[in-house]
Amino acid sequence: MDPFATGGGMLQTEDQWYIFYHRQTNRSSYARQACAEKLERRSDGGFQQAEITSCGLNQGALKGIGTYEARIACNLWSINGTGRYDGKSPKQKLKDHPYFTQSGKDRENNGDQYIANMKNGAVAGFKYFEMGEANQIGITIQGNVMGTMQVSDKSDFENICAEIEVNGSGKEMHTYKGALNIPSGKRALFFRFQGEGTVDFHSFELMKD
């Protein structure tokens, strides 16, 4: 596999196989971010289809305590669903959709990628975390916003695990915190903005008080 290509490929390291692929950033089909997922073998020697997660080359679920950058989200959609960047005028057509970007130009180091343009009803999903200790959650965002960031372990938000009030303006980073009530075990985390304005979502922290 060419390690510099993001078109996709399989790699074996010791006894474990991984699939490498890419996804689009900056609302362009020409801006690409390399990603990887762990593969599981079937009894016939083939591979099960890999689920897209936030775990990458990590050996299992991420720790349920710590700070994580929003750029590791594996699900991202607006109140109107998802879209494709390979059509005509994608930036205009998808102007109400969230997207991955960074400050400044693309670069090989000192990255600060984040999720931009989260409007009312937009969702960012992260899979998976080994929960059990955290009972507080914080989010670091910027933007002119007023509303609530809801957190759930379900993509349909049937179970609300946290509601964090947000009220900020300008380009300053703001951190907001709230109580977290989530079942123990391997869990996903979905963040949904409900309110006015546009959120740039930079990171979140899982904490124990």
Predicted regions and their residues:
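Carbohydrate-active catalytic/glycan-binding domains of CAZyme proteins
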Residues: M1-D209
